[in-house]
């Protein structure tokens, strides 16, 4: 399925059904998830959870996972949490993303879990929070907030 066809399917389904279809493998992962290697593991109204195993392919020049990987993971989890609240035909886009990094990641960190949760969902704007934890230690890696614009059907 092409990325454009996947986007079209997302508009045909309500957001929760779409995220669950990704989670259950009924739809292919979006290109960014394939590129970075993260996957959805939970979805509920107002909530989305992803997992990633950090590897050397994610490294920056100083030998740790690039902050953009964590930021992308957080943006994805929080955005998908917002998406789970949307009816068919309604989309969203990130207006603002604020990430706080509290510890670095390396390939030795082991798998991480990223949870996104909606704080507020209005008619035109939604806000959400996200956190990344090391699965093995439970240590917080980063936390974030986002503001998303709700895109009404055309």
What are these regions (language model features)?
Residues 1-154:
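Terminal targeting signals and extreme-terminal segments of soluble enzymes
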């Amino acid at each position: 399925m092409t990325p454009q066809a996947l986007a079209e399917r997302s508009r045909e389904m309500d957001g929760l059904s779409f995220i669950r279809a990704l989670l259950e493998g009924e739809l292919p992962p979006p290109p960014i998830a394939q590129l970075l290697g993260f996957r959805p593991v939970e979805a509920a109204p107002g909530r989305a959870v992803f997992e990633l195993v950090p590897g050397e392919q994610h490294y920056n020049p100083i030998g740790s996972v690039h902050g953009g990987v964590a930021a992308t993971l957080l943006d994805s989890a929080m955005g998908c949490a917002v998406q789970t609240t949307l009816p068919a035909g309604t989309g969203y886009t990130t207006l603002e993303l604020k990430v706080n990094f509290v510890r670095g990641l390396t390939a030795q960190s082991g798998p991480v879990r990223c949870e996104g949760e909606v704080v507020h969902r209005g008619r035109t704007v939604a806000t959400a929070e996200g956190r990344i934890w090391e699965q093995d230690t439970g240590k917080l890696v980063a936390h974030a907030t986002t503001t998303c614009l709700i895109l009404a059907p055309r």
